[in-house]
Amino acid sequence: MLTKRIIPCLDVDHGRVKKGINFVQLKDVGDPVAIAKAYQEQGADELVFLDITATNEARGTLVQTVEAVANQVFMPLTVGGGIQSVADMHALLRAGADKVSLNSAAVADPSLLTAGAEKFGRQAIVAAIDTRWQADQNRYQVTVNGGRTSVDLDAITWAKQAVAAGAGELLVTSMDADGTESGFDLRLHQQLTAAVQVPIIASGGAGSTTDFVQLFTQTTVSAGLAASIFHFGELTVPQVKTALKQAKVAVR
């Protein structure tokens, strides 16, 4: 049985880890290298590193910061933000990332996923999808540019297209739940796992061990990602894993 993964997320803005609510109101959390090391000591399964302002400010991801983090941690590292080309992917993988995450650029040009998968293998290519529930259309809508821009695209449809293009994994964030600590969007992740056959990392809304238990008992996602609860010490990775083990969910 495949074990479920618990993944802290480092949202990095100008070299500092930040965390906001619904993608705004950013608070400073600290130095990414120190925080990454702390998560490694806690037994996190992987780490996601997102340069949250890279795409919006049209600059490359902070390769030096990625290198510094990769030198200190030995768990798989996924890096995203500002990736516009295969050359950008190569630079990050060379800097120590195990996987690269594409969001806005892939929506604009899905062939980037294909090119990356052909060069580095599907397992290294993650499509990140930020989505909001659109009640009047009865669907999840894709957003880009760090959640600032809505796109006329159904998130479930885009998930299928991204996988067909070459994504070996999806990192899906509920913008409605992000930072609220009110629980994962179970409906979203149920729809996604029914639609695609690749591993899905669920993001947005984690607030308690119960939220992780519900995520893994009510959906078939592969991983749960969180930032706020871990950064501010409300929960530790071992506490989450203990609760999951008690609920008979397989974890490392």
Swiss-Prot record:
The keyword Cytoplasm applies. The keyword DNA damage does not apply. Gene3D superfamilies: Aldolase class I. Its EC number is 4.3.2.10. Transmembrane segments: none annotated. The active site is at residues 11, 130. It comes from the Bacteria. One of its GO terms (molecular function) is imidazoleglycerol-phosphate synthase activity. It is found in: Cytoplasm. One of its GO terms (cellular component) is cytoplasm. CDD domains: HisF. Keywords: Amino-acid biosynthesis, Cytoplasm, Histidine biosynthesis, Lyase. Pathway: Amino-acid biosynthesis; L-histidine biosynthesis; L-histidine from 5-phospho-alpha-D-ribose 1-diphosphate: step 5/9. One of its GO terms (biological process) is L-histidine biosynthetic process. It catalyses: 5-[(5-phospho-1-deoxy-D-ribulos-1-ylimino)methylamino]-1-(5-phospho-beta-D-ribosyl)imidazole-4-carboxamide + L-glutamine = D-erythro-1-(imidazol-4-yl)glycerol 3-phosphate + 5-amino-1-(5-phospho-beta-D-ribosyl)imidazole-4-carboxamide + L-glutamate + H(+). HAMAP family: HisF. Belongs to the HisA/HisF family. Heterodimer of HisH and HisF. IGPS catalyzes the conversion of PRFAR and glutamine to IGP, AICAR and glutamate. The HisF subunit catalyzes the cyclization activity that produces IGP and AICAR from PRFAR using the ammonia provided by the HisH subunit. This is Imidazole glycerol phosphate synthase subunit HisF. It comes from Lacticaseibacillus casei (strain BL23) (Lactobacillus casei). The gene is hisF.
